[in-house]
Amino acid sequence: MLNSKNYLALGLMSGTSADGIDLAILITDGRSKIKLGPSDYHPFSKSFKNRIKSVFKEEVNIKNLKKKKRIVEIENEFTHLNFLAINKFLKKNKIKKDKIDVIGFHGQTISHNPSKGYSWQIGNSKKLANLLNINVVSNFRNNDIINGGQGAPLTPIFHYYLTKKIKKKVCFINLGGISNITYFDHKSKTNLNNILAFDAGPCCSLIDDWVTQNSNKKFDNFGLLARKGNVKDKIVKDFLKKPFFTKLPPKSLDRSSFSIKKLRKLKIKDGAATLNYFVADTLLIAINCLPDIPDVCILSGGGRHNKFLVELINKKIEKYKILLSENYNWNGDSIEAYAFAYLSVRKLLNLPITFSKTTGVKTPLTGGQIFTFI
């Protein structure tokens, strides 16, 4: 008989935009039962965000002692910020620590390079577990990469069960720092091995970087800046010449794979417009890789707040029905935090989180490492 226990899990996510921590409570059996609880967001200060970004692209086997020390300092601060955010979140929602079965702690990605055999997330899981007296699951990507997978995306299994009641062919699009797509057919009895998922291209990370480097803003609110700009088609075409876009899925992307240097001579509004058009084009390319036309495309992630980008996506893929996650009463800012809460429970149950058509592994694999508190 299957273990039908329901677990109360807390998920923590800091994405490639590196703007803060998403927190979410989930009640689940680690399989098809999913109940979304409260969620919240804890922003990073501008100075800490800049410190994190300063160590992006670093190789996992750094030999420079000064750089090593700096990353350890940033990791300790990052871990402490997660600890503070959790305490504030639990107090606000009147949740006692001893009621939480497990924490799914993604950490902050510094570098993702599956071709070299690693994906590096900072965050001291053992320290966090001991501070909170709650077991923590992290290092979700390593087992997949060791076994020949891309280590990303990891959220498709959660997307699949979250949308189980939508008896349609579904395309779930996460507009995060990097955009990714999950496709499955709930009309038929889809085997988990038939879930298709892959990274589509850069998204909010590039747009936010451009805006923060050229203004005192953290992001282009609602895409108002981009809306005023003129797209530079040649730059968009140059971006799209990257081999990544002709590579067949499954595939994954590091935030540092693309640079905004091509835009440096542009006005801020024109650069923003150009990047938005580029992102929309990458999604069109990605959706054309799907085995069938989806009945509905569901947008989640921070990019869905960019009304200009959403309009462009609608124009590019106008033959598809596009809805926001809020149409289903899901907070689109918290989907990935919910997902890592879910994945942590699957680790406790030794259930797989990656599959041949999501990351390229030969057989379904479990993922994550359990850090027990002392």
Q: What are the language-model segments listed below?
A:
Residues 216-296, 307-320:
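A contiguous, well-structured pocket-lining segment that forms one wall/lid of small-molecule binding clefts
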